[in-house]
């Protein structure tokens, strides 16, 4: 019985109209799937745009200097640097020049405020601490607000917990998927800490 069915199927496949029918059905299925995927993508894109316009995320970020709930004589800082640290007032200092209250010692000549050393015009920097310090410049407020508005949907889970300018710069300057070309390769292996809107320029691997 199986041999008979196989024989009949082979004979059918030899006929051109059967092959044409199979090809036609396959083509229709392919086109239908492609159009459905495109419609779904357009619908999702429109939905995100509507959500952006009609339901803006209530960002908690405050850009006023000194808006921390901590005592005014205390500073938060970037903590992780082995050699450099940035405090919430935008000062960059060597770890040995960090005061007991968490602030950089501004009396030390090497301590600089709003320092953009090693930072490019696109907002990408060689060192994390300089990225945070440069990002804390009051003039960067409009850039950061624009980023928050444009990134509302894609990054809402990450940035909803951010409450002020300092926390935003700490989060923004950390290396992200925008900085990565491949899994273990940076787009720009030198200036990989970015506070700007655009990803680093793509360098050849």
UniProtKB/Swiss-Prot annotation:
Please state the gene responsible for encoding this protein. Answer: Spring1
UniProt-recorded name of the protein: SREBP regulating gene protein
Regarding tissue, the record states: Ubiquitously expressed with a slightly higher expression in the liver and kidney.
Major localization class: Golgi
Q: Which loops or segments lie on the Lumenal side of the membrane, by the record?
A: 36-205
Q: Which UniProt keywords apply?
A: Glycoprotein, Golgi apparatus, Membrane, Transmembrane, Transmembrane helix
Q: Phenotype upon knockout?
A: Knockout leads to early embryonic lethality.
Q: Which PANTHER family match?
A: SREBP REGULATING GENE PROTEIN (PTHR13481:SF0)
> What family is reported?
Belongs to the SPRING family.
Q: Output the Gene Ontology cellular-component terms.
A: Golgi membrane
Q: Which InterPro entries match?
A: SPRING1
Q: Which residues are glycosylated?
A: 67
| Pfam families assigned | SPRING1 (PF10218)
BP GO annotations? positive regulation of SREBP signaling pathway
The subcellular location is:
Golgi apparatus membrane
Q: Which residues lie on this side of the membrane: Cytoplasmic?
A: 1-16
The function of this protein is:
Positively regulates hepatic SREBP signaling pathway by modulating the proper localization of SCAP (SREBP cleavage-activating protein) to the endoplasmic reticulum, thereby controlling the level of functional SCAP. Plays a crucial role during embryogenesis.
How is this protein organized at the quaternary level? Interacts with SCAP.
Q: Does the keyword Transmembrane helix apply?
A: yes
Topology relative to the lipid bilayer, per the entry, is: Single-pass membrane protein
TM ranges are: 17-35
């Amino acid at each position: 019985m199986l041999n008979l069915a196989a024989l009949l199927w082979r004979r059918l496949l030899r006929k051109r109209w059967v092959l044409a029918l199979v090809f036609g059905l396959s083509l229709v299925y392919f086109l239908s799937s492609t159009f459905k995927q495109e419609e779904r993508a357009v619908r999702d894109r429109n939905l995100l745009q509507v959500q952006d316009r009609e339901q803006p995320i209530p960002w908690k970020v405050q850009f006023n200097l000194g808006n921390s709930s901590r005592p005014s004589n205390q500073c938060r800082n970037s903590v992780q640097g082995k050699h450099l640290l940035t405090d919430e007032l935008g000062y960059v200092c060597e770890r040995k020049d960090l005061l007991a209250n968490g602030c950089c010692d501004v009396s030390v000549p090497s301590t600089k405020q709003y320092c953009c050393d090693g930072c490019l015009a696109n907002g990408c920097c060689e060192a994390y601490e300089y990225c945070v310090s440069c990002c804390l410049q009051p003039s960067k407020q409009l850039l950061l607000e624009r980023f928050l508005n444009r990134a509302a949907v894609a990054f809402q889970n990450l940035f909803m917990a951010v409450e002020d300018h300092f926390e935003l710069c700490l989060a923004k300057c950390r290396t992200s998927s925008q900085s990565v070309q491949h899994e273990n390769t940076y787009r720009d292996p030198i200036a990989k800490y970015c506070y700007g809107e655009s990803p680093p320029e793509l360098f050849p691997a």
